[in-house]
């Protein structure tokens, strides 16, 4: 089979400045983007007589998260999103649940350490978005406090922090009130 070459194409185009799909081209080298996106997810079972801490805020509840740390699903998902954006691993790698040093630890301490690590690697947090799936208790009364607490720990304006809560319409383990999950997206810039 005959392949059309540059000479054939140029002869057809006769000097036209229009793009010719047959003309060979060299791939342009793309600059590495300074903006990076990360995604995080976390889930914990719920049990009686444990504290429920979400987004750095203790939420009044008869049930709380079963976890090695304080079980803050929102912060754990956020840490994974931030670490993922910078390709720095995940929360389990940095703070393994096999290490007694992290037993019962306040997750805002973990988030602070993640933010410091990002800074050391030359990243700045642009914005974060978190969705928490929990049937009960309702989180709406606590959202603004969560946003403020997370912004404080990360050292960014509260307007760069979005926290949303949803039920799962009684579907899945969240709907059956067996557990809570959180999803997070983070945008960071390499400065």
Tell me the role of every PLM-derived stretch.
Residues 34-145, 154:
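RNase III-family endoribonuclease catalytic core
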């Amino acid at each position: 089979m005959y392949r059309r070459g540059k000479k054939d194409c140029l002869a057809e185009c006769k000097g036209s400045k229009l793009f010719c799909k047959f003309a060979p081209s060299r791939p342009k080298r793309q600059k590495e983007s300074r903006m990076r996106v990360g995604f995080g997810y976390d889930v914990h079972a719920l049990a009686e007589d444990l504290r429920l801490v979400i987004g750095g805020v203790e939420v009044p509840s008869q049930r709380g998260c079963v976890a090695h740390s304080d079980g803050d699903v929102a912060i754990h998902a956020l840490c994974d999103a931030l670490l993922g954006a910078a390709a720095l691993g995940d929360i389990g790698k940095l703070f393994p649940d096999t290490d007694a040093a992290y037993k019962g630890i306040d997750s805002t301490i973990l988030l602070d350490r993640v933010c410091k690590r990002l800074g050391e690697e030359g990243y700045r947090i642009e914005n974060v978005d978190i969705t928490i799936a929990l049937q009960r208790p309702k989180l709406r009364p606590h959202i603004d406090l969560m946003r403020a607490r997370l912004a404080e720990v990360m050292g960014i304006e509260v307007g760069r922090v979005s926290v949303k809560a949803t039920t799962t319409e009684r579907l899945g383990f969240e709907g059956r009130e067996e557990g809570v999950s959180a999803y997070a997206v983070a945008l960071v810039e390499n400065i």
